[in-house]
């Protein structure tokens, strides 16, 4: 039986010499894994159309478990997302976070909306790094943890202006009054914590174009990646390339 699904490719893995397995996130928010025969043979026309971020109508034979791709009617190649290595890397991180946050049979329309929001904003030249930060903030509960960025984890006071660090000992942000209780607390600027709280709580439908200083973006990213490693044991493969790019830039 032939099935039709509109969706965006969020994962692509080579399989053997000429095939690949892709995963699409369909418009209902379900993951659909598909085998693509002869995908790496240029004459098939599937090489370009089975890359990350391609949005299309996927027509496939439904088998037990893995579907077999028959053809793709491309809606948007999202080619511009692959032109800049930084944009591409952070867009891949967004897709990977959403992919890993979902069980195989899970359906979440929010996940598709979140992915589409991030890819569209990157194409509109919003910071790709900021988009990955938004996804990391929004998807925390799916990985089994949550952080309040608006109150001290020791006193539970909500005076945002006094928050200056994150403590793994106390599993949250702490105010300047209690900084001596954890000598290993990570200093985080108050503005960074304030903006993380805003981005975590603000619905994506209400987010206008955002412009945040690069130093603050870096501080957010570094903290969030540490949180995910500490509380969920996950390190995202896409982050490895981002780290390599940072090291090259620093030389």
From Swiss-Prot:
Keyword DNA damage: yes
Domain of life where this protein originates: Bacteria
Pfam families per UniProt: RecO_C, RecO_N
This protein's UniProt keywords: DNA damage, DNA recombination, DNA repair
Coiled coil regions in record: none
One GO cellular component, as annotated: bacterial nucleoid
Gene3D superfamilies: Nucleic acid-binding proteins, Recombination protein O, C-terminal domain
Record-linked InterPro entries: ARFGAP/RecO, DNA_rep/recomb_RecO_N, NA-bd_OB-fold, RecO, RecO_C
GO biological process, one term: DNA recombination
Stated family: Belongs to the RecO family.
PANTHER family hit by this protein: DNA REPAIR PROTEIN RECO
Job description of the protein: Involved in DNA repair and RecF pathway recombination.
Protein name per Swiss-Prot or TrEMBL: DNA repair protein RecO
Organism (species): Staphylococcus carnosus (strain TM300)
